[in-house]
């Protein structure tokens, strides 16, 4: 993994903001070819299409992959690089170690801010949050007079009211004022598919991205990987971009902690089912021309519980928030 070590060293020595000391552990986003922001144009490059948004990845990341007919992006929410490396090495998810030996393990930075709503929008537009406008999990929407949750598309003060911004005239499919990847690919003869859990395929955030995309829900990992294999096998001559998203590692990380054994076990389950139900059963014909990309929207940092950070410990502050 010499390439991985060299790439990490370069990212650690990336340019700093003058006069702003962020500490040694802080990495600035590498928008010049080393970030998830550069993935959409990279997909276009591999499929021999004009790019979308930011430039593609650096040449050393693009060049190894030629004659690509199909790109499958597997996005595991919150899968940090150092945890992936640990889980590859400790027997939790050895399939990715095997694939990396025959491919490339390339460190990429996320975007700023590195939150799901902002990162997924960048992956579907090729634009940074400063350009596409989804600058965080919660946003002040001046035209609607409220702070909104940009995943649920509801006022942050409301509970169990997902999508309620539509009652105020908010149209998620019309919110972004720039082309999205599905529309761009369709214009150049590439069919786009999105496989996500049934519970989120019609979420407001998903509706923002999925114009021109064939969206398919799944209920379990068995459902996901068998459906994906059938999709690939039954359309051998079709040029494809396939988006696979799973949020379980992120959910477990928030609930139990990113380094908890249950979080690792969830990724192990995800990876084993991928290997057994998709990879090992994929025909040689379907493998030919298929590029598989595993990535994440962001990582997670484990924090120690501390009562001073609990709002209940500050009743006077809490009283001023209502």
Label the predicted regions.
Residues 1-322:
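Feature captures the catalytic ectodomains and active-site-proximal regions of enzymes
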